Amino acid sequence: MEGGKIAIIIATKDRLEILRETLQSIRRQTRLAAYVYVSVSSLEDAPSGNSTEGVIVLVGPPGGSAQRNTAIRQVPLDVEYMVFFDDDMELHPSYLENAVSFLEKNSDVVAISGMMIADGNISREAARALLEQDTAWAGDPSLRDRGRHHTLYACNAVIRSRPLRQTLFDENLPLYSYGEDYELSLRLKKFGRVGRLSNAVGVHLQTQAARVSGKRYGYAMIANNWYFLQKGVCHIAAPWSYVRFVLVIVLKRLWINLQNGFSGQLERDPWGQIQGNLVALVDIICGRSSPRRILDL
């Protein structure tokens, strides 16, 4: 198919079987990418055998943001669109075709994420069946760039290459790089619109294998958002950005974790998250908060 070249980038760690099935989903796309990069911090995480067909493996520093940037720096300059997928995605075969076609027709849009018709607590088989059966999304494409859809969702994102090369992901966000999609979205908005595209669809399995601990995740949730405020990266101007931080980021998150803990919903380690939340708050009060402190927990 004619059109701009596409490069797909997947950052992964310790999830070889999950990655293999996601690569199969990518190969079923009606519009294929010119390059598929798998970015790892160790060759132990790299695919092998039939999974490597058409795949370029890159090894670099660990962490979601760092691994993505390793790949971005290797993408040839004639590639117009870079696409990011988590390693636990199942895509409708039309995802790439619909997403890139929309960007080609709308020059004022710099980046999009698709719409997830399911997000978490779903098997690969159920995801495939759902994508075959659910056609509610079909029709004329529309970009949703208001409310909760105003930023990218990094499990799936299609971004114009030129502005992305100028921004990159923030490598001060280590490990799982919590909030990197929100932060990048706000910096990309100076180049154009960012939003969610109605007819680029998929399922995010949210497989928990090899994710960071609850304590680290809880720390990052608070500390990373505080870091964004200190950088001046927020969709709400001060002082309301700080009000949002207290009410939505801190108090709401603590309340949700307490509810999950007392109700026995322990899949995501709510008690560990609460510990991390509280450590982050103490660090903020003591003036030592940093996203990289997660490495010490």
Named regions from a protein language model:
Residues 94-127:
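Conserved donor NDP-sugar-binding/catalytic core segment of glycosyltransferases
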Residues 216-224, 236-297:
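Non-catalytic, C-terminal membrane-associated alpha-helical segments of glycosyltransferases
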Residues 24-33:
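Short, acidic, metal-binding catalytic loop of nucleotide-sugar glycosyltransferases
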Residues 79-90:
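Short beta-strand-to-loop acidic/aromatic patch adjacent to the donor-nucleotide binding site
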Residues 65-81:
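Active-site nucleotide-sugar/metal-binding loop of Leloir-type enzymes
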Residues 152, 156-167, 174-200:
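A short, conserved alpha-helix in the catalytic core of glycosyltransferases
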Residues 176-177, 203-227:
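Nucleotide-sugar-dependent glycosyltransferase catalytic core
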Residues 114, 130-149:
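Short, flexible, basic/aromatic active-site loop/helix in glycosyltransferases
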